[in-house]
Amino acid sequence: MTDKSTFLSVLFGGGSVYQDLDGDGEVEDAEILRRVEEEHAQTSDNSNSDNDSGNDSDVPTSLMVEGVQDPKPGSKRRQPHRMATLSNLQSSAGPGARSVSFAQGTKTQTPIRLTKPTGVANGGLPRHKQDLGASIRTMVDPKELALWKWANVQNLDNFFAEAYMYYTGKGLVSIILSRVLNMSTIMFVVVFSTYLGSCIDYSKIKGSRTLDEVHVKQCYAKLGSFHVFVLWTFFVLWFMKLFQYVKDIRRLVDMKSFYQELLEIDENELQTISWPQVAKRMATLSEANAATQVGNSTKQRIEPHDIANRVMRKENYLVAMFHKRVLNMTVPLPQPLQRIFGRPQLLSRALEWNLSLCILDYVFNPAGQVRPMFLKSTHKQILSTGLRRRFVFAAIMNVVFAPFIILYLALLYFFRYFNEYHKNPASIGTRRYNPLAEWKLREYNELPHQFERRLTLSYIPASKYLDQFPKEKTALVSKFVSFIAGSFAAVLGIASLIDPELFLMFEISANRTVLFYIGVFGSILAVSRSLIPEETLVFDPEISLRYVAEFTHYLPPEWEGKLHTEQVKNEFSLMYEMRLIILLKELASIFLAPFILYYSLTQSCDDIVDFIRDHSVHVDGLGYVCTFAMFDFKQKSPDHQPDEDQKMLKSYLYFMDHYGDKPTNVSQTQQNVPMYSSVRLKNDGLDLNNSIMQKFQKHNGHHALSGLTQRDVGLSPAAPTATTATSGTATGAAPRRDLINFDVDESFIDQTTSNRDMDNDEQPKDKERVVDMLNQFYKKTDNMNLGA
């Protein structure tokens, strides 16, 4: 078996996620001939007995090899080195045969039979010594080759991560183009900044009229030794990254073949197709080719939930740790400064990278699985000490590289955003969610592109919510400033139109012409006008914030009854900050990161180790994953802290809104459950009036646009106050455990586990499942709507 697998690896090559395919796929002719001879000798010895008995137990059905006899005398001689392709999916394979075709929707399957090169006779050697690998790869059917590689994937985490990266990158050409432009951007920033700093004599600019007069001859030869060392280090790293990208092209080509041949998604369709549809096609592919399942796992089907768990395995732990406040991201300030600024928390992209390096790379092994040591309480002290050392080492490295990082980021942000702010000064006041807020708002198993889309939908209503609050003092000052600046700009502009040659070069102050002041007053006018609220804006912050929560799914219980107050507005503003403030925090975090790593995060080491151990659950076919990501509602948290804002429930409902097709194995009584797929909009669009999340919010009294209460929609006045998908537990009310009639013995993980153990023709056991709960929930909401 090993020799056959190695032989196929030599022929077809592959990426790092394929078994024995880590090489470049090119070997010497002698090595190929030796392997062909050994492989054929092993199969020819027992060919008669195997053919008579039909016993192929020594070869799996996914890699069965047929012997090829020498041509009989008088028969037409075959061309040497032509290889019969992988046998097509045949209808004569029996009742269990299945193949997959997404266009027609048929499902049949047969074992994949790989035939030998027809140029190999019983003697064992090819008739001509040629590079068989290259010739066979060009002649084998691309679809069957892609299916063979899919059957030999060894690390599904890496494979699905690469598949998702390929999807978000929008195909082979777009990914390569993006990488080329990114590498060019980095090179441009370094080379251009070096030229501006070393090749221009700024003392000569005032009396010069051409670039040659201020250009320093042979400027690069005059660079200091430290500057030269930094440039050489950069170029070495740059070319190493370039080599990595070039080497990665082969895996991208394999992934393109997987999408195009097996999922039947070409480059054009990839630009518009939604990820849930891609995930469902992957699930259909794995189900139709169960005989070629990877790793001989007992898991017979890959579901969209499994794919999301594999892609988000590491990120789910970070989402949970931020949600449970395990990570201490407080900026360590002296006591006098703490009295003024309090204890602010800071998270930047640089700190995110440090967290990934220190925590995730420590918890997970290279295969993407949780290290067994983290699952045993006896190793807590050792692991905590090791994690603390990683934080300290990261703090030291941040101090060493801080000058270079701050210089690069400053130049990058300057080149990227200067033109934007120059063309549109009002954009300086635009807002975005800061990184810490993003991790608070992110949900379990929510892929990055889905999360970004949800936040993007909330930008406009969030800005309108903040703009509603009275800013009379700011508005009065802004109107006065805009009037003064507009007056100066109007006079200078009209004068320039009357006599352009005179006024454009006319100096109002020393070395400051009319053109300079027109730009200054124009920028002041644009910024001041952006601070004046619209006169047609209706003031209703409570309804506006509830509408924002339709997208963010965030409305803490302590905000209840205070949505109109300045306190809630200020707390929301700390999450939804101005872009300029976020950029300044990114630059400041380069200097503050060492202190946060050394003083704050080192205090969280014990909690991090305990959290990983207590919130990891083993799932057959997946390995250890975060308990919250499995939507196991019956499992109580080891820390016994109630999930006040119900993040796991919201994550489950939002997941169903995206992937909402019913499980394949459901009883006939569950077929009429209205799921999200029946109201799917184009490209992952969400119908807020028909989604599961919206019905859940209405059931709990949060009608964002109408402001209706539970009594308005027909709920019993005696019913206890319910928690909402966006607010958690109402103030003074106990959380409801029966939001959608959850049984304490039922959970999503029970449903998925039982489905994996059933055959396709077997109906599930007659017991209550999550779909039954949703069915009852929809009946209630429909009755309430009819009653209203």
UniProtKB/Swiss-Prot annotation:
InterPro entries: Autophagy-rel_prot_9 (IPR007241), EF_Hand_1_Ca_BS (IPR018247). This is Autophagy-related protein 9. GO terms for cellular component: autophagosome; cytoplasmic vesicle membrane; endoplasmic reticulum membrane; Golgi membrane; mitochondrion; phagophore; phagophore assembly site; phagophore assembly site membrane. It is found in: Preautophagosomal structure membrane; Cytoplasmic vesicle membrane; Golgi apparatus membrane; Endoplasmic reticulum membrane. Forms a homotrimer with a solvated central pore, which is connected laterally to the cytosol through the cavity within each protomer. Acts as a lipid scramblase that uses its central pore to function: the central pore opens laterally to accommodate lipid headgroups, thereby enabling lipid flipping and redistribution of lipids added to the outer leaflet of ATG9-containing vesicles, thereby enabling growth into autophagosomes. The keyword Signal does not apply. The gene is ATG9. It comes from Yarrowia lipolytica (strain CLIB 122 / E 150). Keywords: Autophagy, Cytoplasmic vesicle, Endoplasmic reticulum, Golgi apparatus, Lipid transport, Membrane, Transmembrane, Transmembrane helix, Transport. One of its GO terms (molecular function) is phospholipid scramblase activity.
